[in-house]
Swiss-Prot record:
Localization of this protein: Cytoplasm
UniProt function note: Inducible lysine decarboxylase that catalyzes the proton-dependent decarboxylation of L-lysine to produce the polyamine cadaverine and carbon dioxide. Plays a role in pH homeostasis by consuming protons and neutralizing the acidic by-products of carbohydrate fermentation.
Activity regulation summary: Inhibited by ppGpp, also known as the alarmone.
Gene (name only): cadA
Enzyme Commission number(s) of this protein: 4.1.1.18
PROSITE patterns named in the record: OKR_DC_1 (PS00703)
Protein name: Inducible lysine decarboxylase
N6-(pyridoxal phosphate)lysine sites (modified residues): 367
Family: Belongs to the Orn/Lys/Arg decarboxylase class-I family.
Amino acid sequence: MNVIAILNHMGVYFKEEPIRELHRALERLNFQIVYPNDRDDLLKLIENNARLCGVIFDWDKYNLELCEEISKMNENLPLYAFANTYSTLDVSLNDLRLQISFFEYALGAAEDIANKIKQTTDEYINTILPPLTKALFKYVREGKYTFCTPGHMGGTAFQKSPVGSLFYDFFGPNTMKSDISISVSELGSLLDHSGPHKEAEQYIARVFNADRSYMVTNGTSTANKIVGMYSAPAGSTILIDRNCHKSLTHLMMMSDVTPIYFRPTRNAYGILGGIPQSEFQHATIAKRVKETPNATWPVHAVITNSTYDGLLYNTDFIKKTLDVKSIHFDSAWVPYTNFSPIYEGKCGMSGGRVEGKVIYETQSTHKLLAAFSQASMIHVKGDVNEETFNEAYMMHTTTSPHYGIVASTETAAAMMKGNAGKRLINGSIERAIKFRKEIKRLRTESDGWFFDVWQPDHIDTTECWPLRSDSTWHGFKNIDNEHMYLDPIKVTLLTPGMEKDGTMSDFGIPASIVAKYLDEHGIVVEKTGPYNLLFLFSIGIDKTKALSLLRALTDFKRAFDLNLRVKNMLPSLYREDPEFYENMRIQELAQNIHKLIVHHNLPDLMYRAFEVLPTMVMTPYAAFQKELHGMTEEVYLDEMVGRINANMILPYPPGVPLVMPGEMITEESRPVLEFLQMLCEIGAHYPGFETDIHGAYRQADGRYTVKVLKEESKK
């Protein structure tokens, strides 16, 4: 970080010559000097060059107005104002969180000024670095010799082997040197929450508006289990979102709890909806408790917020209404909601404490902020027994954490602190909304078909758009007002084939075909439904990437309308079965898969499959214990009616459990089986379109088997 910007506007010798001297002095201190043309050019530079560490400008020309503009972007950036003897400096800077230094235009002062700038730059770096990351950088720079783990010793061991050297060269020396042992006492301990690790947790809690925050190094799958193990002791009953992540199913397999499921909605597109407000009411819960064997009043609730497709809840209503001791919002996909006013009241850490309740929010820092994979956080608001909670934390946390993951978690929080973080999120929101509008424009201008966007008719305001009962765009039935909101950065594109009410069209392009084309061109889709594709506009998505996606979508339309051969348009798919796809054209492939979906009446089938849950014969914990005792057998998928499932069955998409361990598909819930059979049939007819179904195993004959409990194990 060594770039200094000088606004080159002087025009007179007594100003130009001192600046030229300063330029030379700064270069001797290894600064890189750049000269923006004007104010707008400077602001663009600050926006696009994060390594800028200072701005030098003429106070007579720019003064306070420029400072205010810079403050909105980075309130910590050092500013250096040059003034002459007659300049007016009677301004109050008390309200600005700025580092402003004033210098006079004078010859012979360049060395002193350059040293002052170097000192201020060091202070700036020290200010923006969070505590653990700062301590880790310091430790690596000191280059101490250690006789403890890890065995590669800062990368030395790798360089003793040819293949190890290749590995070392790829990842670089700092990655190796920062991979250190928990024996390094000056960095404290992740497990004991001491030293710089404790300071990092306190720092993160302040940034995310939490009472207490924890860094988790094995993803939100682990964070969810930590919260659940503490909040729901064995023998208790919990309320849990049926559209929960599979990690929460694993929690129920590990802990002997009785689940009562919240039942979310879904629309014809297969987009996951929210849990209706009625599900949170005391009377509804009391009825479910009465209907569920061995259930007692729930002590804990788990809600997925946002949904996979970007729907956020009115969390204030849930916190106030839900009568449980603790509420866990699994917010893996929205770690950014604390940094824009459009998310106020729509996330777990919004607002203050809730009397008599503990609110948890787990977030996948790595998913949509800037952190290494597996980086996750737990935020807590309310009173917990920290010693007991830490037992659950240590149960799921390695004693050899990777400090790179831990430091990246803290750095992600530091990036979101203050105006700089707000600017990052606002930039994502603006890019996503602009992309949405471009799709709508191209749809209007295109001949024949084009992609559509799942969103309200008017998106002129920057907000989370509400789903209203008097609107039809969302396709949900009996929606509650002021309950669910669409996050603008989660962009769902619609392909032809299905209307919002579930009516099937004669012409259709299944989204899986578009996803395969995009993958051929280096663009990975987050989630693919029957006729929809989800794209996430995270802070890492820039204008270039958004334009590349637009270009790829228009290229797909052009190639599809030309009816190119599959082997030319989708070469990877062609290689799955060259004989099958040899002479097939893209329109034939699309129409045949579309007809298969129409044949099964997918919208109606999905409604029925998710309307009636399989019967819970035993808890997931009890079913897993029987599996551990070897009391399972495999049967064909077609034979699972009336059998108790041993594992969760989770088709992707949508990526949420369809059948839980210990549940039985009955005649009443047969649509669940029919839905699974339809997914398998598409893959059987068209090589390369097999659905990934966790818990179902494809055999050599192409049929699927599932694991069920042996008949005698029901007792």
